[in-house]
Amino acid sequence: MGSLSIWHWLIVGAVVLLVFGGKGKISDIMGDVAKGIKSFKRGLSEDEEKAEAKPVGEPSLRSLDHQGAGDPLKTPDARKIG
C-alpha cells in the first residue's frame, strides 16, 4: 500500500507534462475556454436584444364577423318559410 504502481507514476507524469510541458498549454486551454464563454454570453445577449425588439402587443388574430351569428331558426328568412 505504501508503494506506487506503474499506473500511478504514469498519471503523475502525464499531469507534470500537462502543467509544465510545452509553451503554455494550460494558458492556451484557459484562453480557449474564456473565448467560448464570451461567445456564449454574446449569443445570449443577441437573443435578448431580438426578443426586446419584438413589440409585446396583442397577438395578431383574424377577427370573425359575428353579426349574423344567432339561432338560424330565428332569422327573418326562416320565419318566412315556416
Curated annotation (Swiss-Prot):
One of its GO terms (molecular function) is protein transmembrane transporter activity. GO terms for cellular component: TAT protein transport complex. It is a single-pass membrane protein. Keywords: Cell inner membrane, Cell membrane, Membrane, Protein transport, Translocation, Transmembrane, Transmembrane helix, Transport. It comes from the Bacteria. InterPro entries: TatA/B/E, TatA/E. It is found in: Cell inner membrane. The chain crosses the membrane at residues 1-21. GO terms for biological process: protein transport by the Tat complex. Belongs to the TatA/E family. The Tat system comprises two distinct complexes: a TatABC complex, containing multiple copies of TatA, TatB and TatC subunits, and a separate TatA complex, containing only TatA subunits. Substrates initially bind to the TatABC complex, which probably triggers association of the separate TatA complex to form the active translocon. This is Sec-independent protein translocase protein TatA.
